[in-house]
């Protein structure tokens, strides 16, 4: 089973349609679940301390959606990059040898808490470019679909 745990709701119609499109393409290969946790509003003129509080709250909400037996792939700017073939091999190896529940985590706009980073089994940097977090959902789903097609 594939699960996406995401911070915040999808707001733009075309992105929602992209998520729906790739979700329906993935379903013949495996079950997929998308969980949206509420994002925390950052105060005006937020300090580094305020940012950490927001990341902590959002991190707790996301961690509450992750079970012990799940293999967690965290989207992280400090993660390692892997191309579509490498991602496909990673997913295939997980399914074959160890885990049948893979959870992709997409944090909020301020990043993720240290606890979430520590829980991650793998940290994945999808690109050197910066994307809106909502667009990352579409990109991740497309890459998961592509990974299944490559297998």
Go through the PLM ranges and name each one.
Residues 1, 100-104:
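Loop/turn-to-beta-strand initiation segments
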Residues 1-26:
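N-terminal beta1-alpha1 ligand-phosphate binding loop
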Residues 4, 73, 107, 140:
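Conserved RecA-like P-loop NTPase ATPase core
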Residues 5, 33-35:
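General small-molecule cofactor/ligand-binding pocket signal
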Residues 10, 77-80, 108-111:
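Short glycine-rich anion-binding loops that position phosphate/pyrophosphate groups of nucleotides
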Residues 31, 38-100:
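S-adenosyl-L-methionine/SAH cofactor-binding core of RNA-modifying enzymes
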Residues 31-33, 122:
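Conserved beta-strand segments of alpha/beta enzyme cores
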Residues 110, 114-151:
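Structured adenosyl-cofactor binding patch, chiefly the S-adenosyl-L-methionine
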């Amino acid at each position: 089973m594939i699960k996406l745990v995401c911070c915040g709701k999808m707001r733009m119609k075309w992105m929602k349609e992209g998520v729906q499109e790739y979700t329906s393409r993935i379903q013949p290969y495996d079950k997929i679940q998308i969980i949206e946790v509420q994002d925390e509003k950052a105060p005006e003129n937020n300090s580094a301390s305020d940012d950490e509080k927001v990341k902590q709250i959002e991190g707790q909400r996301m961690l509450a959606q992750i079970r012990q037996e799940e293999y967690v792939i965290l989207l992280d700017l400090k993660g390692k990059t892997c191309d579509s073939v490498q991602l496909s091999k990673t997913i295939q190896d997980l399914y074959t040898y160890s885990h049948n529940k893979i959870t992709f985590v997409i944090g909020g706009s301020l990043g993720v808490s240290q606890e979430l980073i520590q829980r991650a089994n793998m940290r994945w940097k999808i690109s050197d470019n910066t994307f809106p977090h909502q667009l990352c959902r579409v990109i991740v789903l497309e890459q998961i679909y592509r990974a299944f097609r490559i297998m």
